[in-house]
Amino acid sequence: MSVNSKVKMTLIYIFLGITTVVSVFPLLWMIIAATNKSVDVIGGKLTFGSSMLENYQNLVSQQPLWSSFFNSCKYTLLVTAFALVVSSLAGYAFEIYRDKAKEKIYAVVLMSMMIPFVALMVPLFRMYSKLGLLNSAVGFMLPSLATPLLIMMFRTNAKAFPVDIIEAARIDGLSEFGIFFRMYIPSMKAIFAAAAVETFMNALNNYLWAKGIMSDNTTQTMPMMISNLISGYVTDYGMLMLAVLITTIPTAIVFFALQKYFVEGITGSVK
């Protein structure tokens, strides 16, 4: 290895090291802060403390922690499951089926990505209010069931699915849904894993829409509960960081369970 190559590799490793520290430090600081009192967090203490149990006791006494946690998990799992089914069917159909109008429809779907969700909140709220969907899982789920990004990801990956296999399956008498569920889905585990992690994370962290339609304390989610901990006068940062730490647990579990396919799915979706 030449001197220039060694210097280049050294610089690359230094850059990767700095990037890793910058990425990991906020997570580590959050864990440390969850074990300390608020005054220690404000003072910049960077060592583990012994106040996690006290923070937990204060949290459960002031907020409906576990009902909010289970609400978030329930809504998020429902959104993820239905979004994967709807978006994968749409992406598959846009790529596999031949129709003169499909490209125009697909263009409209992609153009909708340019509309910020904030601009749609008021009309959606009025519509859901008249339909009686406020404070309900259905009302929380519907705006996330068919996102343009997921449809685009599934369509891009459907390009790699051999059309000859589909034609052969049709000749053998397999239905269209049979082709999709028995052939397409098993061969596209990577993109489903990537889409699942993306959808799960977005749904779990969905604060704005949840705040808009979930006015009942029995239906509030973790982001809403965390916002209740932030006060204009006194904020217990140790308790706040513990709540944030608990919120990250479901996403971490899903990511590590699907990490085998996650990177492959992300790289495949941008071919």
Regions found by a protein language model. Name each.
Residues S2-K271:
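A structural signal for multi-pass alpha-helical bundles of membrane permease subunits
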